[in-house]
Regions:
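Structured domain cores in non-transmembrane regions
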Residues: 48-82
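A composition-driven signal for long, intrinsically disordered, charge-rich low-complexity tracts
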Residues: 18, 22, 31-35, 69, ...
Length: 142
């Protein structure tokens, strides 16, 4: 029983540290992004790799923006571009998607912090641990 409590405390500590770190990093990068938008900060391209990694950890899906531009001779090129690949772009639609992505990441890490202290979460985790392990390892649950 003593070892179970030690393992549980270690898992709880790791999860709290991971979620708190993610939440604080989200707030930090969101402030850097807002400073960049107002012209008071450095170029945001420096932070694009860590922000992309943060969004991946928070399971934020990559938003796409439709792009139409004239290429000449009466022709138009259309494409979908990733917002995360164009973070430093100050277009209104890009900024809106970025702010929404920061809010989603903040919510994900906040939810994780709250789940750490919920007994129902841990009970559910114990009951569904085999299926979660299979999902994590990429094994089909069928």
């Amino acid at each position: 029983m003593k070892y179970f409590l030690i393992v549980f405390a270690a898992i709880l500590s790791y999860r709290v540290a991971f979620c708190l770190s993610g939440y604080l990093r989200t707030i930090y990068y969101e402030k850097k992004y807002n400073a960049y938008l107002t012209g008071k900060g450095e170029i945001f391209t420096l932070y694009s790799a860590p922000v992309r990694k943060l969004f991946k950890q928070a399971k934020v899906s990559t938003p796409l923006i439709a792009l139409c531009e004239p290429v000449g001779f009466g022709k138009i090129r259309t494409a979908n571009v990733s917002v995360f690949d164009n973070m430093a772009n100050k277009r209104q639609d890009t900024v809106g998607h970025m702010m929404n992505s920061f809010a989603q990441a903040r919510g994900y890490f906040r939810m994780g912090l709250l789940e750490c202290f919920s007994p129902l979460y841990w009970i559910q985790m114990i009951f569904f641990l085999p299926s979660k392990l299979c999902e994590f390892l990429g094994v089909s649950s069928d």
